[in-house]
């Protein structure tokens, strides 16, 4: 643990340690984060708390979920700082917040330290809670995280507070008794004074103090103590103890930690989904080639490209896409659009920002962030400004912008996916029905995505440039750390909405590609059979040269998008029949066959009549086979590295292939995925997509 002692000559300014924290891949860091999140016990020592642990305690209801344990080795140093305060006062020492007033009125003096702490809590209990649905209470998850982080800070022994108070707050955590804190009212410098004063208010038994019981009831301080098993009655605070609890950044940094846990997972998920986007769009995977990204030097982009490259290298879709893209190359764009082709370059900087913000927040939750700092070894009370939560405000502003940019890319990809002019042969709006005139698929969902994205871009605006001078111009610059963290929480929630919607759309596209291949196979089989029946023989009984047109007929089918004709395959207004007829006419005009012209064109007429009779039945049979799971052509997703994600959505969450006929709405399915993401259920399927990745790009051959 960092603390008193000689200056580290090798890294006196801590830049080396900060750089070392960024070693290794972002994915490995996320895996460690998830592992820490799943630990059943969090033992806090003062300087080793991790973002994943904060998120775990926040989400757990009590010790049955995650237990919190104090490091007993911290007891002597905590006791030493508490005793130093009392000894200093006894010898006439003058310490801010102990013998003086607060903030802009610190010129005032008092010898009644305990009474000063009571007044500190009284005047800081300035929050408004409201009632019912209009309430302004901080979510219990955030309060639990704040309690954990505050204990961690105070455990370092620089704050002048008794160990017994930290034990009491820990008991509240472990028994699921959560103080009620106001949602608003802090500028996170001097720390989160107003919300933290309500934690202090509960342990001192203030009459307005309330808590949420394990069964969700609001209870007063007395019942809260009883439920938590805290004996000995309420605490009467010694000098400095109230200030130690309230004068710190723990609410802002705690919420920031929980937000960054989710943000890191969503960042990796966005990389995986960009690869799936390439799969369903029949994209060109060369955009992930390592040389391209190596030459640009940015580690975030290099890793994003390598992750996408890994998924695409193990994808059955890509071998099929290669054949599709090699057909008539001069009639197709040479490159994919930016939303796909530059996705590593777009996501990379966002991941770098998110990673840096995470490390900044992790440093903050392990910092001593109150004032004054008690240096027992030198016998000093150091009056400084560690309560200034600027690392939180700036990190949250930066992270929120990165989150908004991830959402912007997701919206761009989604917009291509649902647009038949850009989606390389998928249906308009990803409609899955037989009749596209009665199925508008994801049209409403695209409108919702536009709404989500617009709000997310608005939230990307910074908070920290809206600082107001406060408290008699003593707090004339302040961080707005908790405010920024709250807005980042909103941004993460909206990105979850977008991600959920996008995943449902991608799974729909996967199944449309499966349907497309089966319909195309049925069409080719049907055309082959009809061609053999109609085109093989002349009326004279001789072999007809028209039989040699079969290969060209199949090529014409390959060139035509299945969903451009699947709802009415024999319509003269749709391209399939037009192209097949053109093949036969071209053959008749160029074959030099001695067969009479009338016979040639009668064959074309007969060919089309036979198709009109057989083809709709074959296409319907293909649809039924796909729906029943008996399709002859397997779904390529099964042989792709992205399959774990698809399987989870389809099998575990029970999301279905959407059609207008089923009446199941897109929102119902998106909600299932949203809940899955919010409950952390998507983490393992996401990581399973990357379980074979060795952390390196493919070799440049």
Swiss-Prot record:
Q: How is it modified after translation?
A: Contains an active site 4-methylidene-imidazol-5-one (MIO), which is formed autocatalytically by cyclization and dehydration of residues Ala-Ser-Gly.
Q: Enumerate the residues binding (E)-cinnamate.
A: 247, 335, 341, 371, 443, 471, 474
Q: What is its EC number?
A: 4.3.1.24
Cross-link for 5-imidazolinone (Ala-Gly), residue positions: 189-191
Q: What sort of enzyme, by top EC class, is this? A: lyase
Lineage: superkingdom: Eukaryota
Q: Where is the active site?
A: 96 (proton donor/acceptor)
* Stored CDD domains: PAL-HAL
Q: Which GO terms describe its biological process?
A: cinnamic acid biosynthetic process; L-phenylalanine catabolic process
Say yes or no: keyword Signal present: no
Give the PANTHER family listed for this entry: HISTIDINE AMMONIA-LYASE
Protein name listed in UniProt: Phenylalanine ammonia-lyase
In the UniProt record, the gene name given for this protein reads: PAL
